A protein has these predicted regions:
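AlphaC helix of the protein kinase catalytic domain
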Residues: 2-11
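Conserved HRD-motif arginine in the catalytic loop of eukaryotic-like protein kinases
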Residues: 160
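Structural helix C-cap motif within protein kinase domains
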Residues: 109-113, 156
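Activation segment signature within eukaryotic-like protein kinase domains
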Residues: 19-20
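Conserved catalytic-loop aspartate of Hanks-type protein kinases
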Residues: 96
Length: 242
């Protein structure tokens, strides 16, 4: 997907939604087995010649119980990481949804919302800065897609989509009702000029995170990684059980 975005510059709204539906469906399959990917990004989304989308590279994925979440020092790619990952906090399905929203933003605009000279700079932007609406960059972005992206990328997990099923419903509706106002508003989206004040201890935690700095590798390198589906999950469980 990363190469495809580079080739086209940016994707149409319809193509973005169609790819996103397949991407989120793959995530939903993982989440249904209590697997959190933790490194969703276009480099890990493979588009086959027949247009099928696969979520790949579960290298830092973690299994949870139905009531358990993850708190760990392992970090995915900083340009797509959620605020809670950046600060080393609790990670669950909503963290993957944030990363999916960043990937949608890149499909629509042709670039990631936050960039900087270092991984720490980018991580702090995920924590402090509000994402500028894709409509500012691409005025013909449908209202429904804009709202979906902004809801996915809320700073607080409680105001994002709570699961992939909710997100899929809105993505499918956006295909047939691009300008619809059906997306529930969560909290008021902060003005883009607002910043969140971080104390020195929180900044220090971000600076000590273990980021994957290779954000723009050739996605062909992921072709041999394990794709996620129910069969591969069952095979992996049998291997682990001996």
């Amino acid at each position: 997907l990363k190469d495809y975005i580079k080739k086209k510059g940016r994707l149409s709204a319809k193509e973005t939604i169609s790819i996103s539906i397949q991407m989120v469906t793959g995530l939903q399959a993982a989440h249904n087995h209590h697997i959190i990917h933790r490194d969703i990004k276009p480099q890990n989304i493979i588009i086959s010649k027949d247009g099928k989308v696969k979520v790949t590279d579960f290298g830092i994925a973690r299994a949870t119980t139905s009531t358990q979440t993850i708190s760990t020092s392992v970090m995915g790619s900083v340009h797509y990481t959620s605020p809670e990952q950046a600060r080393g906090g609790v990670v669950d399905e909503k963290s993957d949804i944030y990363s999916a929203g960043i990937s949608m933003y890149e499909m629509v605009t042709g670039h990631v919302p936050f960039d900087g000279e270092s991984t720490v700079t980018v991580a702090i932007k995920h924590l402090q800065e509000e994402i500028i609406s894709p409509i500012v960059e691409v005025p013909d972005t449908p209202k429904s897609l804009e709202k979906i992206i902004l809801k996915c990328t809320q700073k607080s997990p409680m105001y994002r989509y709570q699961n992939c099923e909710e997100l899929l419903l809105d993505l499918k509706r956006a295909l047939v009702d691009p300008q619809g106002g059906f997306i529930s508003n969560g909290p008021k989206v902060n003005n883009v000029d607002e910043t969140v004040v971080m104390d020195t201890q929180e900044i220090a935690r971000v600076q000590n995170r273990d980021y994957d700095g290779e954000d723009y590798d050739d996605p062909d390198e992921s072709y041999d990684d394990e794709e996620y589906d129910d069969d591969s999950y069952d095979r992996r469980n049998r291997r682990e059980d001996g």
